[in-house]
């Protein structure tokens, strides 16, 4: 198991540098927020993970085109937190947004699309909607 609190410490130091060096809507700031969110997620602090994933997402929405794969990843990260928290309707909402971007931005045989289908199917499975899960 990783030392997530140590990772978080370094992610936060890096983020402080990014904040001083980059404009507030720079995608690298969003990537930094995502890394911090990921550390909180791995530590089991899902509300903090969600907070940082949402900060990242707000920057990506402003800085990137609407079909950019990083936006899809951002939606997926948020969906993952909601899945773990058991809020399946919210998880589906974000996984489906992610999937729509991936369908537009990626080739039909891209592994990330397979992951997207799997995420949506897993949520339906968790909800007990097994026939719907099998569609994915």
Residue ranges of each PLM-predicted region?
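Conserved alpha-helical positions within TPR/SEL1-like repeat arrays
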Residues: 15, 27-42, 57, 69-84, ...
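Short coil/turn linkers that connect adjacent helices within long alpha-helical scaffolds
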Residues: 20-24, 62-66, 104-108
């Amino acid at each position: 198991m990783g030392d997530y609190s140590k990772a978080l410490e370094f992610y936060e130091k890096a983020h402080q540098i990014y904040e001083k060096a980059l404009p507030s809507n720079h995608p690298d700031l969003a990537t930094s927020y995502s890394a911090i969110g990921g550390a909180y997620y791995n530590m089991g602090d899902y509300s903090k993970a969600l907070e940082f994933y949402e900060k990242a997402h707000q920057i990506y929405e402003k800085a990137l085109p609407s079909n950019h794969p990083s936006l899809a990843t951002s939606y997926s990260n948020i969906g993952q937190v909601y899945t773990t928290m058991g809020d399946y309707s919210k998880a589906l909402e974000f996984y489906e947004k992610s999937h729509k971007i991936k369908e537009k931005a990626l080739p039909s045989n891209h592994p990330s699309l397979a992951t997207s289908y799997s995420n949506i199917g897993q949520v339906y499975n968790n909800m007990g909607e097994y026939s719907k899960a099998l569609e994915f």
